[in-house]
């Protein structure tokens, strides 16, 4: 196996651990559970599977995952707040395995979310799928952002300009940065 194949395999395994962490936590997402407890469960799962949590102590962050509840866009800090019926929750997990990072997140609904919340979840998922569908050699990163922004704005939502997607590998946040907006408008 060449060096690139080895790196890709390590990234795949780290990504699989991060994804498995989200699979594990799914059954726990119910009203009454604190975001601190979600953090503890995810931390233990990652550790028990040979990994480490990348966010823990990263730039002073004192939790092992991010829990963004309702109006928190991203990088929410787990705490004593308990989940309530109707909440929407994004859990962002970054696992380190064999010195490589796997970074993913998933949106959860707690009980019965509002129609507006479900619309937001559906539109963001659709924009992700549309942006993945256009990927092929020769496409530019700006094409991805354009696809996302166009779809989101047609549904009367807006994109977050202060954060972006990023590459993974043997560094937590690395190139390329993938903006969620059209570079035509910058």
Model-identified regions with their sequence ranges:
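Active-site neighborhoods and metal-handling regions in enzymes and metal-associated proteins
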Residues: 1-184
